[in-house]
Swiss-Prot record:
The keyword Nucleus does not apply. One of its GO terms (molecular function) is homoserine O-succinyltransferase activity. Its EC number is 2.3.1.46. It comes from Enterobacter sp. (strain 638). This is Homoserine O-succinyltransferase. It is an enzyme of class 2 (transferase). Transmembrane segments: none annotated. It is found in: Cytoplasm. Substrate binds at K163, S192, R249. The record marks G111 as: Important for acyl-CoA specificity.
């Protein structure tokens, strides 16, 4: 089944060029199917690029997915036209009384910013508190993982001395876990973060189950036993060129970044990179939609089962 989006969203034409089945809202109204309602809180600066990445992954499920985009930062964006935000994004007040099957909270380039210095930190806390009673399952990505661990579990910000950037190998810990069903025993995924996620920290201070980690003991994928919250510390949604764009941006800014690990062929930034994580990213999102959202969400969202404690 396709994803459902507003007719004029730029991602419609972009994804159709990749043979992705996108159904405009005007056509979807003629189908007697209860789609999954998924809300995306997009915290990334280049919002259109991020929309394309997540919509691509959501589109590969056999389930029909109705996507709504949420913003909580009222400041003028330097990377996304205000017309786009006004046309395709809702504010929290627009949806605070609604229920959703799923919520995705994206990453954000805030790894070196203290939580209380984040301009929209109060709004982040508000959304996470609201989600306990209004969302069946929430998926946190990269920086959002760090924010959620602080808000939900009181874990202080853990920061690496150097940025972790590259494509790293991970291994699954529970072969029969639903979120990793169909995963290879070892798989690759991109990372781009200052945030640090030692697996020992997650085990010692939360009741979350770690499902995949690196050989160095960094947690990559973990979730609550009731499937209400899931965390992925990398960026499985990234395009093949995203890490390269970040690298060259930092080079131009005079930051002397390290070449992303295991990314450029022959470790040469002049050779175009290839994505080695695409199948993993697709399977992760299919599993989340199926086992963490579809299998446990009520048919009538008015019968949402609160609350996440």
């Amino acid at each position: 089944m396709p994803i459902r989006v507003q007719d004029e969203l730029p991602a419609v034409n972009f994804l159709r060029e990749e043979n992705v089945f996108v159904m405009k809202a005007s056509r979807a109204t003629g189908q007697e199917i209860r789609p999954l309602k998924v809300l995306i809180l997009n915290l990334m600066p280049k919002k259109i690029e991020t929309e394309n990445q997540f919509l691509r992954l959501l589109s590969n499920s056999p389930l029909q997915v109705d996507v709504q985009l949420l913003r909580i930062d009222a400041r003028e964006s330097r990377n996304t036209p205000s017309e786009h935000l006004n046309n395709f994004y809702c504010d929290f007040e627009d949806i605070r009384n609604d229920n959703f099957d799923g919520l995705i909270v994206t990453g954000a380039p805030l790894g070196l910013v203290e939580f209380n210095d984040v301009a929209y930190w109060p709004q982040i806390k508000q959304v996470l508190e609201w989600a306990k009673d209004h969302v069946t399952s929430t998926l946190f990505v990269c920086w959002a993982v760090q924010a959620a661990l602080n808000i939900l579990y009181g874990i202080p910000k853990q920061t690496r001395s150097d940025k972790l950037s590259g494509v790293y190998e991970h291994h699954i810990l529970h072969p029969h876990a639903l979120l990793t069903r169909g995963f290879d025993d070892f798989f690759l995924a991109p990372h781009s973060r200052y945030a640090d996620f030692p697996a020992a920290l997650i085990r010692d201070y939360t009741d979350l189950e770690i499902l995949a980690e690196t050989e160095d003991g960094d947690a990559y994928l973990f979730a609550s036993k009731d499937k209400r919250i899931a965390f992925v510390t990398g960026h499985p949604e990234y395009d093949a060129h995203t890490l390269a764009s970040e690298f060259f941006r930092d080079v131009e800014a005079g930051l002397s970044p390290e070449v992303p690990y295991n990314y450029f062929p022959k470790n040469d930034p002049q050779i175009p990179p290839r994505a080695s994580w695409r199948s993993h990213g697709n399977l992760l999102f299919i599993n989340w939609l199926n086992y963490y959202v579809y299998q446990i969400t009520p048919y009538d969202l008015r019968h949402m089962n609160p609350t996440l404690e």
